[in-house]
Design a protein with these regions (language model features):
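Catalytic phosphate/metal-binding cores of nucleic-acid and nucleotide-processing enzymes, i.e., regions
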Residues: 1-88
Length: 88
C-alpha cells in the first residue's frame, strides 16, 4: 500500500540525504511493514508543496502506547530507501 506524508523542508532534506531514517506520525492509517511512503516537501513560506518528492519503504513500526516518551496514538516508522528500478 502507498501512503503520502507532508514533510516540512528541513525534515524533507534530512530524509533525502539519508540522515533521517524514521518518521513519528499519528497512528491514524493502516501502516504495515513493506508499505511505501511518498514524502512531499511542503514550504511554509510558499504555503504549498514544492514539487519535490522522496520515496521510502517502511521496515518496522514501533507503537509504544505511551511508553518511552511516545505519546499515545503515535507510532514511529523505520524507513529504508526504496531500491531503484532494475537494481537489486
Amino acid at each position: 500500500m502507498k501512503h503520502e506524508i507532508k514533510a516540512q523542508e528541513r525534515n524533507f532534506n534530512w530524509i533525502r540525504s539519508g540522515r533521517k531514517t524514521f518518521e513519528i506520525t499519528r497512528a491514524n492509517k493502516e501502516y504495515r511493514p513493506g508499505d511505501e511512503i511518498l514524502f512531499r516537501e511542503w514550504s511554509d513560506i510558499m504555503n504549498s508543496y514544492t514539487g519535490r518528492t522522496e520515496e521510502r519503504i517502511i521496515s518496522y513500526i514501533y507503537s509504544g502506547g505511551g511508553q518511552y516518551g511516545l505519546a499515545p496514538g503515535y507510532i514511529i516508522l523505520a524507513l529504508l530507501k526504496k531500491p531503484e528500478a532494475g537494481k537489486c
